[in-house]
């Protein structure tokens, strides 16, 4: 009985902690990585398209629903959409959005990163020699359904619906290959 009660309290505490951080209409946030929109839409699968909203960009949340978040960036409206693969991995819109948007990005930390990390972040692409953290800032979190753990030697991204990009790391967390 005690174990069940403690478990229920832990679950309830976890749920309220997550809900307290939920992104809501009117929030002013920053991008935690580069985003790669397809016109005015960003799918939570995080396609690596040529266009880019830079890391640390200021955005204002206009609307949040169960499956999408509308935000304003530099006077243009964008929509962050929960795709079926992310949803199938049991990730909510809030969880997915919080991987890419937050109250403040760490610009000072980015400026202290290596030259290769800074170049990759600026280009929005992974390069050999970058750190995991640099890749995360440059490309965003890899898709949840294909990368449930980030502590693996290869992250798989989708360039678009048909092509993938694999980023391989050595045991020190540095990129050894991008294919």
What residue ranges belong to the model's regions?
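Conserved beta-strand/loop element in small beta-rich adapter and peptidoglycan-binding domains
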Residues: 45-65
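SH3-family beta-barrel domains
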Residues: 21-45
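Sec-dependent N-terminal signal peptides
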Residues: 5-14
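N-terminal secretory signal peptides that target proteins for export/translocation
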Residues: 1-2
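Boundary regions of SH3-family modules and the immediately adjacent low-complexity/disordered segments
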Residues: 74-110
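A cross-family detector of function-defining hotspots
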Residues: 66-70, 74-79, 110, 115-179
């Amino acid at each position: 009985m005690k174990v069940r009660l403690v478990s229920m309290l832990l679950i309830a505490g976890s749920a309220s902690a997550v809900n307290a951080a939920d992104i809501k209409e009117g929030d002013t946030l920053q991008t935690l990585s580069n985003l790669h929109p397809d016109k005015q839409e960003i799918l939570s699968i995080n396609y690596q398209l040529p266009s880019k909203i830079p890391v640390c960009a200021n955005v204002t949340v206009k609307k949040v629903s169960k499956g999408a978040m509308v935000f304003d960036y530099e006077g243009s409206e964008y929509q962050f959409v929960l795709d079926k693969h992310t949803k199938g991995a049991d990730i909510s819109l809030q969880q997915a959005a919080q991987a890419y948007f937050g109250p403040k990005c760490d610009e000072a930390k980015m400026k202290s990163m290596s030259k290769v990390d800074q170049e990759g972040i600026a280009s929005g692409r992974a390069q050999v020699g970058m750190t995991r953290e640099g890749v995360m800032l440059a490309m965003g979190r890899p898709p949840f359904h294909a990368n449930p753990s980030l502590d693996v030697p290869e992250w798989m991204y989708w360039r678009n619906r048909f092509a993938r990009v694999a980023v391989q790391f050595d045991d020190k967390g540095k990129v050894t290959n991008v294919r």
